């Protein structure tokens, strides 16, 4: 009989296109500056929090800690696409299993 592994975490992975401020620290021509627009950014990561005010994504995980965190205001998200779901088990984080 195969022993069923206990799921430690399950996270959905998303691709997100979002709007952010653009800034320039050099001198710019007045007319050229009028053509400037906000930036469209791209993030791919695992969704941790989603609410009406923001989405929190992370890109790395080890045990109970995450890294490479991006918090995007929900109102700035232009497009979001679910890629897949990642299921992690306790033994995925045990050194001797790799």
Where are these regions (language model features)?
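Conserved RNA-binding domains used in RNP assembly and mRNA/RNA metabolism
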Residues: 2-98
